[in-house]
Amino acid sequence: MTQPNPNKQIVELNRTSLFWGLLLIFVLAILFSNYFFN
């Protein structure tokens, strides 16, 4: 039995979590800038 490469799934998961982390930081930065500059 040949299984799919588990390393590929781990890389995809890390890329997805990195994307969501950056998106979360971006949204928080917008919210904080609106809060401080108004």
Swiss-Prot record:
GO terms for biological process: photosynthesis. It holds the Pfam family PsbL. It is found in: Plastid, Chloroplast thylakoid membrane. It comes from the Eukaryota. Keywords: Chloroplast, Membrane, Photosynthesis, Photosystem II, Plastid, Reaction center, Thylakoid, Transmembrane, Transmembrane helix. SUPFAM superfamilies: Photosystem II reaction center protein L, PsbL. Its main location: plastid. One of its GO terms (cellular component) is photosystem II reaction center. The chain crosses the membrane at residues 17-37. It is a single-pass membrane protein. The keyword Transferase does not apply. The keyword Signal does not apply. Coiled coil: none annotated. PSII is composed of 1 copy each of membrane proteins PsbA, PsbB, PsbC, PsbD, PsbE, PsbF, PsbH, PsbI, PsbJ, PsbK, PsbL, PsbM, PsbT, PsbX, PsbY, PsbZ, Psb30/Ycf12, at least 3 peripheral proteins of the oxygen-evolving complex and a large number of cofactors. It forms dimeric complexes. One of the components of the core complex of photosystem II (PSII). PSII is a light-driven water:plastoquinone oxidoreductase that uses light energy to abstract electrons from H(2)O, generating O(2) and a proton gradient subsequently used for ATP formation. It consists of a core antenna complex that captures photons, and an electron transfer chain that converts photonic excitation into a charge separation. This subunit is found at the monomer-monomer interface and is required for correct PSII assembly and/or dimerization. Belongs to the PsbL family. This is Photosystem II reaction center protein L. It comes from Chara vulgaris.
